[in-house]
Amino acid sequence: MGALYNEDYDATDMTETRLLAIPLQAYVYRTFSNVMRSASEHLDDKYAQEAHEESETIRAHWEALETRYEVPDWSKEDFDVSEGITNVDTAVRLAESAERFVRQTNLELSANQLLRLLHYRSMQERQWELETRSYLNDLINLVEDPADQKRIDDVLMPWFANKPFMVELTTEELTQLRKKIEDAIKNTNVQKSARQALKKYPLLSTFSSNGSRRGRSNKHRVVH
């Protein structure tokens, strides 16, 4: 059945069903099929045949899934999907990222490997979102003054609203995030407690507000 359904397929010990929920799985397969079909028209002969074959393999999978599970209208439905991919918009973002990745690597990765990449990124994105939201809640709980609570909301929420899913952040962007946090807690008399609370969140606390990261200062990608 091709690379996607090999018996030895292993995405960090996740089953295929858990890797992506069935409707979303069909959507991602369909996206990859279209990406690879298009890419096969522009690649060297060495890769064009592989891209075309993967396209046809994936197409067969998503057509079977859509027929069997009556996949709904993707433009209207939201999906509460485990392991990090929470809705169709997220899937689109991930698929676009994968499409760029395909172009960059000239399709040296199989669809199987790209799905692993998607899964890993979705897990990391979910961790970012959970950490930032949890930390915001911690800050609000630490601050008793309603005016200070509003200050924290006003400073931080617009930043997070523009980056609901953080597939890739530069060190500069992470520095901005930490600076925003520092600005938000400034003059609230909870700086020490807030910094202590931050230690619970490894992705956030890894980056200091001056932009340094233990031994790293270059671009930080979710996929290492």
Curated annotation (Swiss-Prot):
Q: Report keywords, A-Z.
A: Plasmid, Plasmid partition
Gene Ontology terms describing biological process = plasmid partitioning
Q: What does it do?
A: Plasmid partition require REP1, REP2, and a cis-acting DNA sequence (known as STB). REP1 may act by intercalating in the yeast nuclear matrix and binding STB either directly or via REP2.
What's the protein called, per UniProt?
Answer: Trans-acting factor B
